[in-house]
């Protein structure tokens, strides 16, 4: 697909979900790459019953907005407590973007992608940049304490 500005685009609207507790350089790297592939990106600050974030999705969304460069004008941030697929349907997104740092992440993401595909939403898996792959949110929280 070609965007009106003549740039190559994979699609119109994609969603990049995560807990982002906190946002890491790896997350920002995924957003940076994805924003060039789609006309619009929504970074979806979500809940995850397996994780206990330090703040609410709304609080993390506010913090994440502050971290994004001002010129990333095709990137928006939203907080969401439901299923990512439901958000995609409600907001007209047809692709979910996910990042993977290692083999374990890829295995987990392939399972999620299969479920999303069965529900009609495509997943685009972007590998982490090698220099950022070790910097998880867990590591970032440890560095902050």
Predicted regions and their residues:
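Nucleotidyltransferase catalytic core that binds NTPs
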Residues: 1-145
């Amino acid at each position: 697909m070609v965007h009106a500005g003549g740039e190559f685009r994979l699609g119109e609207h994609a969603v990049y979900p995560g807990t982002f507790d906190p946002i890491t350089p790896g997350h920002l790297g995924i957003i940076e790459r994805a924003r060039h592939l789609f006309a619009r990106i929504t970074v979806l600050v979500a809940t995850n019953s397996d994780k206990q974030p330090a703040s609410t999705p709304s609080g993390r969304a506010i913090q994440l907005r502050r971290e994004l460069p001002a010129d990333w004008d095709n990137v928006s941030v939203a907080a969401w407590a439901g299923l990512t697929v439901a958000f995609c349907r409600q907001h007209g997104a047809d692709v979910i973007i996910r990042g993977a740092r290692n083999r374990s992440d890829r295995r987990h993401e392939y399972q999620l992608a299969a479920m999303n595909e069965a529900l009609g939403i495509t997943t685009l898996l972007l590998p982490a940049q090698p220099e950022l792959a070790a910097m998880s949110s867990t590591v970032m929280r440890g560095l902050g304490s």
